[in-house]
Curated annotation (Swiss-Prot):
<dbReference type="GO" id="GO:0005764">
    <property type="term" value="C:lysosome"/>
</dbReference>
<feature type="disulfide bond">
    <location>
        <begin position="50"/>
        <end position="110"/>
    </location>
</feature>
<keyword id="KW-0325">Glycoprotein</keyword>
<comment type="similarity">
    <text>Belongs to the pancreatic ribonuclease family.</text>
</comment>
<keyword id="KW-0458">Lysosome</keyword>
<feature type="binding site">
    <location>
        <begin position="65"/>
        <end position="69"/>
    </location>
    <ligand>
        <name>substrate</name>
    </ligand>
</feature>
<comment type="subunit">
    <text>Interacts with and forms a tight 1:1 complex with RNH1. Dimerization of two such complexes may occur.</text>
</comment>
<dbReference type="GO" id="GO:0004540">
    <property type="term" value="F:RNA nuclease activity"/>
</dbReference>
<keyword id="KW-0255">Endonuclease</keyword>
<feature type="disulfide bond">
    <location>
        <begin position="89"/>
        <end position="98"/>
    </location>
</feature>
<keyword id="KW-0944">Nitration</keyword>
<feature type="signal peptide">
    <location>
        <begin position="1"/>
        <end position="27"/>
    </location>
</feature>
<comment type="function">
    <text>This is a non-secretory ribonuclease. It is a pyrimidine specific nuclease with a slight preference for U. Cytotoxin and helminthotoxin. Possesses a wide variety of biological activities.</text>
</comment>
<dbReference type="InterPro" id="IPR023412">
    <property type="entry name" value="RNaseA_domain"/>
</dbReference>
<keyword id="KW-0540">Nuclease</keyword>
<dbReference type="InterPro" id="IPR036816">
    <property type="entry name" value="RNaseA-like_dom_sf"/>
</dbReference>
<feature type="active site" description="Proton donor">
    <location>
        <position position="155"/>
    </location>
</feature>
């Protein structure tokens, strides 16, 4: 009985540890609201090259993100998409706070090709396209988000 219980506890701890690691990969840095983090990750492409642009995101997360999509549009335009009819989110159909862009936008998709423990050594390839997108939206943080946007994008759910 003791070895079986001990083994079960070890398995549970390993599972919880893995879930914690997976959860932390999708976590936002604490100093940002979800809308601010969305803007950093998906709107503010600080450089025309993925390798340079991804360093900003990677520095906040302290790891090299495997892939990321930058929408070449404005935050205000994505906020406007939040006004489109709600739909179930493709990545989690139990959530009904997603909205289809309705128009294609230019975008750049960054894909990690050279991983490294040292963030500055990570390298990315980039692909450009014009595609629709689906974004999840929530009520804004009344203190830290721009007051003109009561509902804001918080997650890029799908590119189509």
């Amino acid at each position: 009985m003791v070895p079986k219980l001990f083994t079960s506890q070890i398995c549970l701890l390993l599972l919880l540890g893995l879930m914690g690691v997976e959860g932390s990969l999708h976590a936002k840095p604490g100093q940002f609201t979800w809308a601010q983090w969305f803007e950093i990750q998906h709107i503010n492409m600080t450089s025309g090259q993925c390798t340079n642009a991804m360093q900003v995101i990677n520095n906040y997360q302290r790891r090299c993100k495997n892939q990321n999509t930058f929408l070449l549009t404005t935050f205000a335009d994505v906020v406007h998409v939040c006004g489109n009819p709600s739909m179930p989110c493709p990545s989690n159909t139990s959530l009904n706070n997603c909205h289809h862009s309705g128009v294609q936008v230019p975008l750049i998709h960054c894909n990690l090709t050279t991983p490294s423990r040292r963030i500055s050594n990570c390298r990315y390839t980039q692909t450009t396209a014009n595609k629709y997108y689906i974004v999840a939206c929530n009520n804004s943080d009344p203190v830290r988000d721009p007051p003109q946007y009561p509902v804001v994008p918080v997650h890029l759910d799908r590119i189509i």
